[in-house]
Amino acid sequence: MSENIVSVNNLSVSFDYQENFLSKKQKIKAVNNINIKIKKGSFFGLVGESGSGKTTLGRAILGANKISTGNVIFHDEERDFDLTTITPKEKKEYRKKAQLIFQDPYAALSPRMTVRDIIAEPLEVMKITKSREETDARVRDIASKCRLNLEHLRRFPHAFSGGQRQRISIARALVSNPKFIVADESVAALDVSIQADILNLLKQLQHELNLTYLFISHDLSVVAHVCDIVAVMYLGHIVEMAPSRELFRNPRHPYTKALLSSIPSIDPEKKSEAIELKGEIPVQ
């Protein structure tokens, strides 16, 4: 049995680009020749500036973006799923095992549905439960794990704060009992005072439910707080990957050093200047 839950091998994702309707279509590589292994039970961080390809990579691993070259293998306890050759029937099974936590808790929840119906929807769509009683029991169980009260299940999303809405989003992602979670900027839209609460909840759920995370973020201080291993993306490439403490203590790539230099310090005596990257942007 593999110790990895996800293996990404020589993965590239391209999109068609056309300046105007008269110009010729071109291919732009959003993700270029990525190789990573995500170990079971790990909190794997993926960082980089906007446009570096983080979200595209995460969506490709979930099967939401079409893979141009390479492959993604999801190692389940019973079998492996190859996302380049996966059938529609297998994809339905895979979606029970790999889920996404969205960035914006305000846009991710339907204002016309109660919290109970929002959390229960994956169970009904995937036909995981066989009766309303079983569905309600599953919803109540995961809601309590995500620190939601039973009275919350009867309310609509507008009645909740940003942190509470994100807990609802987390409960919806976990109700199908997945083993792998892609958290795409899952605390970026929240106040700093709420971020720590959500991050601690994710860590707690990781231990309780034996979860593996791919945590996508541009906030290095957040990644340092929760991640075991960190990969740095730049222009669709992984430029550096190392255990979290090692990467923050001894960065090797110039881009990683530039990212770390941009983190503000709370020490008024410490003076640090952001490193400016020089030269031309590499051609992909």
Predicted regions span which residues?
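P-loop NTP-binding/switch modules centered on Walker-like glycine-rich loops
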Residues: S186, L190, I194-S272
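ABC ATPase NBD Q-loop/coupling interface
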Residues: L22, N71-E93, S131
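Conserved ABC ATPase signature
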Residues: F156-F160, Q164
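A short, proline-enriched helix->beta-strand linker immediately N-terminal to the Walker B motif
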Residues: V175-K179
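Short catalytic/signature loops enriched in Gly
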Residues: S2-N4, Y17-L22, K27, S244-Q284
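Conserved ABC ATPase "signature" region
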Residues: E78, E124, E133-E151
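The feature captures the beta-strand-to-loop junction immediately N-terminal to the Walker
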Residues: V47-E49
